[in-house]
Amino acid sequence: MNPSFEDPRLNAILTKIDAQERLNTEDGLLLYRTPDLLGVGWLANRVRERMHGNKTYFNVNRHVNPTDVCVANCKLCAYGKRTRDGKAFTLTHEQIWHKAGQGYSEAVTEFHMVGGLHPELTLDWYCEMLRGLKQRFPKVHLKAFTMVEIGYFAKRAKLSTRDVLIKLKEAGLDSQPGGGAEIFSDRVRRIICDHKLNGDEWLDTARTSHSLGLMSNCTMLYGHIETEEDRVDHLL
């Protein structure tokens, strides 16, 4: 049964959803600006039910971040630190493997690992980290390295992003997180994260990752200087 929307403009969105048509910029802006929050929620659930029925899942993971040292110095970031900062940390392989094992049980399904753009850690160092984790926890899914990290690894190793991803996958990488996407708007990125990959570079790296059989997601950082138009463009 279809609802009686408080905002009748949502009927056009429902028609597109049921026809499995892709929404456009105007549709996205309407969904942001309509006062009919319950109507938007109903539409979202309509899509969820069509795609997944009543299935859902819970993931038990551990975050194991190897370092917070980062050369990027993004204005939005409260995580990254300079090497000379007394509070900065960089774990050894042994410390990483030990931390992953703390509180480990068969219920743990994933290790989630991201870090700063460290000026001294090499691609081989990260590959050895992955191999050590796979040897110790062969059943655990390794989700690691944002597209931004991959771009930095490639730059430092003087390799293509594809070659970097191949090496990491061979070492045990199973998938990637979606961090570093922020907002794809060039205008916004120049202000909040000008040292990171631009939007096109981020997406190109993700496409390369997917072409190699790796899966990833994509985050969106909002609530700062971006516009509603920037958000919709990011989602599309």
Question: Which functions belong to the PLM regions below?
Answer:
Residues G39-R84, A88-V114, Q176:
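N-terminal pre-triad scaffold of radical SAM enzymes
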Residues K16, D233-L236:
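Short, intrinsically disordered, charge-balanced linker/junction segments flanking boundaries
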